[in-house]
């Protein structure tokens, strides 16, 4: 029961730190996936790419009847479609992102505790930086995978609706 309560509070803390994490990642993955770059046929970053951004943006703006729709508004609409379908992998990707965010928060907390006690040990700094970096990188990737899956599920649902 104690582990559950601790996990519950770490999950809450990780939710509070979400905006800070996004700043270190260069922005929200959903915003970056919905931002086209001139001369590039994909959005995202080197490890997680989304090749259907222009199609998704076009369909979302038409559906929202708003040629200046914000990225948040577009992603919110895509989420409403993908969450409405139990055949998608979106809940799995969401859970993986939430879990990796909790792991990142836990690694930060543990590093602070370790380094406050062993601040004179140079190797502890290396271990802490390595663990936090790996957790941060994994969290970033999972955020992009989740956002890409939401947009992919949205496009799949729209395409299926147009063929029936």
What are these regions (language model features)?
Residues 2-9, 131-142:
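Hydrophobic alpha-helical membrane-associated segments
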Residues 16-85:
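Charge-rich cytosolic interhelical loops and cytosolic tails of multi-pass membrane proteins
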Residues 38, 119, 160-164:
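Intrinsically disordered, low-complexity linkers and terminal tails enriched in Pro/Gly
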Residues 117, 122-139:
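Transmembrane alpha-helical hairpins and terminal membrane-anchor modules
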Residues 135-164:
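Cytosolic/matrix-facing juxtamembrane and C-terminal tails of multi-pass cellular membrane proteins
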